[in-house]
Amino acid sequence: MNRTVRVLLLITVAGLLPRTIASSSEERKSDWASLEYLLGDWVGEGGGQPGQGAGEFSFHPGLQNRILVRKSYAAYPPTKDHPAYRHDDLTVVYKESDSASPRAIYFDNEGHVINYSITIFPDQKTIEFVSEVLRSSPRYRLTYVKTGGDTLTLRFEIAPPGKPDSFSTYIEAKAKRK
């Protein structure tokens, strides 16, 4: 191949490459459109069985938009029944294929590892993370409800082993975007 043809081929390929990369990036960005309102940094407060607490969480894309990473902490002041403590967790939201529904895996400082399926309700305001049914383990449900442009509520519920649909509220909170 002569040098002129190689240069023209290189220019053609180089000209197409940015469009291909941009197109691929836009496709990946649209993969998370249904979860987009969760993206960003949030501050919240609420309470439940562990007591009244306050904390922060964030959802940010990772691995070139292939996953969403949620980092969270909640701080609880001391009470007459227990000392002050802090709960930290990390969740990775992913899709096993481009057409699959999102799933998540959760880890926390207490040693929990929870696999969730994620349902986005038709109203596009409610997102529900529900754990697998495991015979001898509790089942968990975490629900986010968009209440405004920069506000949401969340509810974390637990169902006892053997009663996978008998959820009771463990924590309820309100959050606002930072």
Regions found by a protein language model. Give the residues of each.
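Hydrophobic small-molecule pocket/channel-lining residues, especially in calycin-type beta-barrels
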Residues: 22-178
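Bacterial N-terminal signal peptides
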Residues: 8-18
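Bacterial N-terminal signal peptides that target proteins for export
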Residues: 1-8
